[in-house]
Curated annotation (Swiss-Prot):
Subunit structure: Acetyl-CoA carboxylase is a heterohexamer composed of biotin carboxyl carrier protein (AccB), biotin carboxylase (AccC) and two subunits each of ACCase subunit alpha (AccA) and ACCase subunit beta (AccD).
Database matches in HAMAP family: AcetylCoA_CT_beta
Catalytic activity, as annotated: N(6)-carboxybiotinyl-L-lysyl-[protein] + acetyl-CoA = N(6)-biotinyl-L-lysyl-[protein] + malonyl-CoA
NCBIfam families: accD
Keyword terms of this UniProt record: ATP-binding, Cytoplasm, Fatty acid biosynthesis, Fatty acid metabolism, Lipid biosynthesis, Lipid metabolism, Nucleotide-binding, Transferase
Role, per record: Component of the acetyl coenzyme A carboxylase (ACC) complex. Biotin carboxylase (BC) catalyzes the carboxylation of biotin on its carrier protein (BCCP) and then the CO(2) group is transferred by the transcarboxylase to acetyl-CoA to form malonyl-CoA.
Family: Belongs to the AccD/PCCB family.
Protein name: Acetyl-coenzyme A carboxylase carboxyl transferase subunit beta
GO molecular function, one term: ATP binding
Segments of this protein annotated with the region Disordered: 282-319
Annotated PROSITE patterns: COA_CT_NTER
Stretches assigned to the CoA carboxyltransferase N-terminal domain: 24-293
Length: 319
């Protein structure tokens, strides 16, 4: 009997055992509730019930914004992967390699060109899963390139910010992206095109000292953490207890730091409405057939799927 119990039964269990995916369930960070992953995915990564906004990948974010989930990937300039030959506990090049394998992205920012309710827009998305969405040379070049394309196409530029700050492994070369992106935003302003920022959870550090807080319209997702320094650092500096909800989206809206807090389900129509107001474009008529995908800068034909847009654009601000 012991042989049947201790040997045969476990072997049968192993043969019949069904493998369970690691991401089958998601635990809500707010309530601790376990939710089926597919339910969260189909709900734009908003936890049903608690309405907690989970992080979205760059591709999922772009799909949620562009018409027909179709856009052109904007070709981005190549940069030196490890200019300082930086190493801490691990080599910087190894960290980049792991982040690329994990996310499928070249760096923390992805830029797409497409249509939002019929109007052409350029959208840049920071992916927090790529080294905390940190801002390095590649990410800075991506933001600048997206702004240049918006100037060239004379259309709005929308950026979804999600970052822990500057990338320390690139030192001052990372910090240089703060003034470079600021100058590029000014180029868009001089072209009289809208610049819209959507602050997601979290948006902290150096990006809040540059392009993430320069929008003509500042929008945030509910509950997003937004700030330059951490709450504990501020409390230790001023030696005072911070109020409840400090650095959260709702607190910043109530104190005039941002314009709107918009639920993710309402984000696409809100962005389309803001773009129409700022560009004085007519509203798309619902009875019209589905809008076609945008024509890339140098190709008159319609795309069948996501493609790369040619990189021709004005010169970037000097490094």
């Amino acid at each position: 009997m012991n042989w049947l119990t201790n040997v045969v039964r476990p072997k049968i269990r192993n043969i019949l055992k069904r493998e369970t995916p690691d991401n089958l369930w998601i635990k809500c960070p707010d309530t601790g509730q376990l939710v089926f992953y597919k339910d969260v995915e189909s709900n734009q990564f908003v936890i049903p019930g608690s309405n907690y906004h989970m992080r979205m990948s760059a591709d999922a974010r772009l799909k949620s914004i562009f018409d027909n989930e179709t856009w052109y990937d904007v070709a981005l300039p190549e940069v030196t992967a490890d200019p300082l030959k930086f190493r801490d506990e691990r080599k910087y090049v190894d960290r980049i390699r792991d982040a690329r394998a994990k996310t499928g992205l070249h760096d923390s920012v992805k830029v797409g060109f497409g249509r939002l309710e019929g109007s052409a827009v350029v959208v840049a998305v920071q992916d927090f899963d790529f080294m905390g969405g940190s801002l390095g040379m590649a990410a800075g070049e991506a933001i600048v390139r997206g702004l240049e394309l918006a100037v060239e196409k004379r259309c709005p530029f929308i950026v979804f910010a999600a970052s822990g700050g500057a990338r320390m492994q690139e030192g001052v070369l990372s910090l240089m992206q703060l003034p470079r992106t600021t100058v590029a935003v000014q180029m868009l302003r001089e072209a009289r095109q809208p610049y819209i920022v959507v602050l997601t959870n979290p948006t902290t550090g150096g990006v809040t000292a540059s392009y993430a807080m320069l929008g003509d319209v500042q929008i945030a997702e509910p509950g997003a953490l937004i700030g330059f320094a951490g709450a504990r650092v501020i409390e230790q500096t001023i030696r005072e207890k911070l109020p409840d909800g400090f650095q959260r989206a709702e607190y910043l809206r109530d104190h005039g730091m941002i314009d709107l807090v918009v639920h993710r389900h309402e984000l696409r129509p809100t962005l389309a409405r803001v773009c129409r107001l700022l560009t004085k474009a007519p509203e798309m008529i619902e009875q019209e057939p589905e809008p076609s995908a945008p024509v890339p800068p140098d190709e008159p034909d319609e795309p069948a799927a996501t493609q790369e847009a040619p990189p021709a654009a004005p010169a970037a601000p000097p490094a």
